[in-house]
Amino acid sequence: MGDVDNLSLPTKLPDNAVVCLMAPTASGKTSLAYELYETGRFEIISVDSALIYKDMNIGTAKPTQSELEQYPHHLVDIIDPTQSYSVANFVSDTQQLVEQIHQRGKTPLLVGGTLMYYMALFNGLSPIPDTDPNVRAQVEAQRQQQGIEALHDYLSKIDPPLAERLPIGDTQRITRAIEVYQQTGKPLSYWQQLPKQALSDNPQQYWLGLAVMPDRAWLHERIALRLEMMWADGFFDEVGQLLTNYSLDAQMPSMRCVGYRQVIDYLIATDHPLISRLKINGQSVDNKGLEVNEAHKSIACQDMKNKALYATRQLAKRQYTWLRNLVASHQPSDTLQTSGAQTEQKVVHSFDTIQDAKAYLFSRL
């Protein structure tokens, strides 16, 4: 049962606590968040890099509008699918929200499965300056005029170590690296080597992480069921509406989200009329006038669903790895585990089930 067997008589959760409920996709963390919200003590902060996008509802398993009204979430529906939102943006927004929630006499409850965000909160980010909007506009103009391959070649000259790690298709990171260099005169790899600064190092706050790592076979069944429900609820049509309502590029972070990426690939493979509204690396995609029969569409559709399922399981696999790393880096000391005393300002406990995490947290309220 993870750490839960070793926890005895834990102290009450202090007023300066920041609680982080961390678990893989489809593991049931949202339901627990709702129960905690109903105690009247918590405000929910979403830790999900897909829920930030407006109009991306079905494929992200976003809470319904009625749920969001009953259980308000911070950092949900905050940008359009055409926009970008960095880890640094998330940390900055979270810092402000944590302070505001504490001022209201409540406890921040961070809930979600974007483990990169949690790693930034617990382990810190390199002190990379924010990009000047004018520099960003200049680099974007370069990308549109020269193409991403030319920018990658440029990056290999100014920051060879980073260029080796980034594939040509990683538009977001390539442009970000060039923005940093053009603004500071130093390569991004230089900034990444500097000491990191973590929001959770604030001595005035107590950060409590609950890392839930359920049985994988059980989780795989939950993932398969969730995807079946998404397709039935109109996920494919949702992507069509996004392409109709927004000027989207297949390389935008929103369209690289699991599920959305596989639908885009299907549209391209079947020469779907919607691809005329899509761009790839800034270049328009034209219909080829292919005659795609129903049998081919059916095969391509099943392939899309299989790939979405596989990609979601791979996402969960990565989430387990990140969770284990967080626990290894911030697990409680032996003294804390046996006494239950709160002697550390930042700690991550591991649990095998959401129910175990629930029992532990409610014992501290």
From Swiss-Prot:
Its EC number is 2.5.1.75. One of its GO terms (biological process) is tRNA modification. InterPro entries: Dimethylallyltransferase, IPT, P-loop_NTPase. Keywords: ATP-binding, Magnesium, Nucleotide-binding, Transferase, tRNA processing. ATP binds at A23, P24, T25, A26, S27, G28, K29, T30. It catalyses: adenosine(37) in tRNA + dimethylallyl diphosphate = N(6)-dimethylallyladenosine(37) in tRNA + diphosphate. One of its GO terms (molecular function) is ATP binding. Gene3D superfamilies: 1.10.20.140, P-loop containing nucleotide triphosphate hydrolases. The keyword Transferase applies. Residues 48-51, 172-176, 256-261 are annotated as: Interaction with substrate tRNA. The record marks T114, R136 as: Interaction with substrate tRNA. Its cofactor is Mg(2+). Substrate binds at T25, A26, S27, G28, K29, T30. Monomer. Belongs to the IPP transferase family. Catalyzes the transfer of a dimethylallyl group onto the adenine at position 37 in tRNAs that read codons beginning with uridine, leading to the formation of N6-(dimethylallyl)adenosine (i(6)A). NCBIfam families: miaA. This is tRNA dimethylallyltransferase. It comes from Psychrobacter sp. (strain PRwf-1).
